[in-house]
Amino acid sequence: MAFSSCLKFYPFSISQAVTLTHHSFSLNLTPPSSTISFASPHSAALSSTDVKLLDSLRSQPDDSAALRLFNLASKKPNFSPEPALYEEILLRLGRSGSFDDMKKILEDMKSSRCEMGTSTFLILIESYAQFELQDEILSVVDWMIDEFGLKPDTHFYNRMLNLLVDGNSLKLVEISHAKMSVWGIKPDVSTFNVLIKALCRAHQLRPAILMLEDMPSYGLVPDEKTFTTVMQGYIEEGDLDGALRIREQMVEFGCSWSNVSVNVIVHGFCKEGRVEDALNFIQEMSNQDGFFPDQYTFNTLVNGLCKAGHVKHAIEIMDVMLQEGYDPDVYTYNSVISGLCKLGEVKEAVEVLDQMITRDCSPNTVTYNTLISTLCKENQVEEATELARVLTSKGILPDVCTFNSLIQGLCLTRNHRVAMELFEEMRSKGCEPDEFTYNMLIDSLCSKGKLDEALNMLKQMELSGCARSVITYNTLIDGFCKANKTREAEEIFDEMEVHGVSRNSVTYNTLIDGLCKSRRVEDAAQLMDQMIMEGQKPDKYTYNSLLTHFCRGGDIKKAADIVQAMTSNGCEPDIVTYGTLISGLCKAGRVEVASKLLRSIQMKGINLTPHAYNPVIQGLFRKRKTTEAINLFREMLEQNEAPPDAVSYRIVFRGLCNGGGPIREAVDFLVELLEKGFVPEFSSLYMLAEGLLTLSMEETLVKLVNMVMQKARFSEEEVSMVKGLLKIRKFQDALATLGGVLDSRQPRRTYRSR
């Protein structure tokens, strides 16, 4: 018979959802047990012989021993065991996945004419499900029907469906539903509930609602589980309003509410950060239906408050929890620790860990991983390592997340040697590195210029069976390009296609930028053409790389053509684009054009940055247009979005010291520069000092030198040395000493465009 008339118009089809990630709707906070257990349906009294054999089977150390004992007993004359004995050995074999032996036992039961029912076959299909072999389940049912003459009943069918849904075998659920009428199964409320759960997991809420609404036509009334499943489906889809509408239907049906139903709605509110609404809902249900929060309710509230950043309120809920006789569990503490870590309050998070242990609540891997990851991000790698040792001492084995956090922390603090040692330790302990592990180490090696070692790490990655990703290749290409080894970078680029790894815009942009910096601009242009042919659209990073090359080479015409092409292809130039073009114009001595472009950008409503201002200010100083340069700098000061940076101040100071204005103006500007927290370039400071000495303004020079030493945080010994030389009027020696210390304070840096 047809399962549901509504399915003529809304067929039960979840084929599009077969590959969906499993989303558990279970309210359990603890993971399900890995062992399965079944209660024997055969409760008839066993003979004393069978009781002894049953006890012996249960006492065997392993499943093989149990099977040997059973086979030995079966060879005795007149061996005719009760079904309970067969089911016991089936259970033992099922736990170890001995499916062939299980089938042989079932055939023995048939040949010995032992009483058999569908419940016996449930043991076999549940064992398959335990080992994630759901594909075998339907063939077992066909075997049961064809070879044993047993037809599945509603209970068997519901249990089978549930196993398929829980194993995310949604396509098999669809097939099973199609066979329902063939098997002559009459659905009950549980059947509908399981099928509705399958539809919700497949994100097909509309058919799930239609199925719920069609239940009365079968003389069935939706129960609490029916409504709760649909509400959970809506919440998983991020549609709390839809869940609340189902709640109203539930009330109209007169369906009673349990803590499970209430907790689903509480979870929905908290998931959306609406913790206050969750509390109001709890109050409403308490007044109407006598609801009282349970462990799950409290945990949901604590988690919701922590995710919203209200950790103090979460701790208050924990206090209420204790008052009501509920001990916070590992889930509660993990929520609070995670919330504190997100707020950067690591010390407080560690205190909560100590409190957790004091209250006999054992931390788990999640607890430690949260703290270790946060400590590493805060550059407290030693503390994180110590915590990992504590974790191990408590018998909790570090997992891949633990190792990855520590390795990442070590790489970020440039402690690559220890990171590699930890990587080797990770493998020796049987914890397989993942893609993230390898990518971090490859990135660290590339940043240190150890490119051969990075390639060796790539080989190790392949040998371990870990899939290379586009991130892996992009990291290597970037490393080789920065080392000016573009030929090798191109080889890695070509290798991606061989290994079936798709290139993305970052891949192309990285190599194009590397080629441009190596002055292989024609190759870069060809690569951009290839990028377009492969369906990748050039973006601002692509164009900016080419633009930078032409601007540095003084080819303003080609630079302008790049900007024109960029606009024509629907890629709007940004401030980096314009800033680069302005810099190129200024280097070519076309400061007036650059100034006009600056104003044009301003008119477009684009916020100007020092990247755009600085080249024009520098160009104006070079043309001895000091007043215009200073006015432009002052204009920058008024821009709250992007005030002058250290480079801006140094350009102006250099311009003033280089004869660009009265010496008093240069002195005043140096004071302003120091007050902003910047330290001047020594070359500019030296020019100013020479000017002051020429004008016999030694006292002013001494004051300025003292201010510079204070801002640059000279040691007492360094200050004493410079002051001593100034006191005996050895100004050149004092300036030389000052310059030497400043150079050590401000080592020359190489800036790489990103």
Swiss-Prot record:
<feature type="repeat" description="PPR 4">
    <location>
        <begin position="188"/>
        <end position="222"/>
    </location>
</feature>
<feature type="repeat" description="PPR 10">
    <location>
        <begin position="399"/>
        <end position="433"/>
    </location>
</feature>
<feature type="repeat" description="PPR 2">
    <location>
        <begin position="117"/>
        <end position="152"/>
    </location>
</feature>
<comment type="function">
    <text>May be involved in female gametophyte development.</text>
</comment>
<keyword id="KW-0150">Chloroplast</keyword>
<dbReference type="InterPro" id="IPR051240">
    <property type="entry name" value="Mito_RNA-Proc/Resp"/>
</dbReference>
<feature type="repeat" description="PPR 5">
    <location>
        <begin position="223"/>
        <end position="257"/>
    </location>
</feature>
<dbReference type="Pfam" id="PF13041">
    <property type="entry name" value="PPR_2"/>
</dbReference>
<feature type="repeat" description="PPR 17">
    <location>
        <begin position="645"/>
        <end position="680"/>
    </location>
</feature>
<keyword id="KW-0809">Transit peptide</keyword>
<feature type="repeat" description="PPR 15">
    <location>
        <begin position="574"/>
        <end position="608"/>
    </location>
</feature>
<keyword id="KW-0677">Repeat</keyword>
<protein>
    <recommendedName>
        <fullName>Pentatricopeptide repeat-containing protein At3g53700, chloroplastic</fullName>
    </recommendedName>
</protein>
<feature type="repeat" description="PPR 1">
    <location>
        <begin position="82"/>
        <end position="116"/>
    </location>
</feature>
<feature type="repeat" description="PPR 6">
    <location>
        <begin position="258"/>
        <end position="288"/>
    </location>
</feature>
<feature type="repeat" description="PPR 11">
    <location>
        <begin position="434"/>
        <end position="468"/>
    </location>
</feature>
<keyword id="KW-0934">Plastid</keyword>
<dbReference type="GO" id="GO:0003729">
    <property type="term" value="F:mRNA binding"/>
</dbReference>
<dbReference type="GO" id="GO:0009507">
    <property type="term" value="C:chloroplast"/>
</dbReference>
<dbReference type="GO" id="GO:0009793">
    <property type="term" value="P:embryo development ending in seed dormancy"/>
</dbReference>
<feature type="repeat" description="PPR 3">
    <location>
        <begin position="153"/>
        <end position="187"/>
    </location>
</feature>
<dbReference type="InterPro" id="IPR002885">
    <property type="entry name" value="Pentatricopeptide_rpt"/>
</dbReference>
<feature type="transit peptide" description="Chloroplast">
    <location>
        <begin position="1"/>
        <end position="72"/>
    </location>
</feature>
<feature type="repeat" description="PPR 7">
    <location>
        <begin position="294"/>
        <end position="328"/>
    </location>
</feature>
<feature type="repeat" description="PPR 8">
    <location>
        <begin position="329"/>
        <end position="363"/>
    </location>
</feature>
<comment type="similarity">
    <text>Belongs to the PPR family. P subfamily.</text>
</comment>
<dbReference type="InterPro" id="IPR011990">
    <property type="entry name" value="TPR-like_helical_dom_sf"/>
</dbReference>
<feature type="repeat" description="PPR 9">
    <location>
        <begin position="364"/>
        <end position="398"/>
    </location>
</feature>
<feature type="repeat" description="PPR 14">
    <location>
        <begin position="539"/>
        <end position="573"/>
    </location>
</feature>
<feature type="repeat" description="PPR 16">
    <location>
        <begin position="609"/>
        <end position="643"/>
    </location>
</feature>
<feature type="repeat" description="PPR 13">
    <location>
        <begin position="504"/>
        <end position="538"/>
    </location>
</feature>
<feature type="repeat" description="PPR 12">
    <location>
        <begin position="469"/>
        <end position="503"/>
    </location>
</feature>
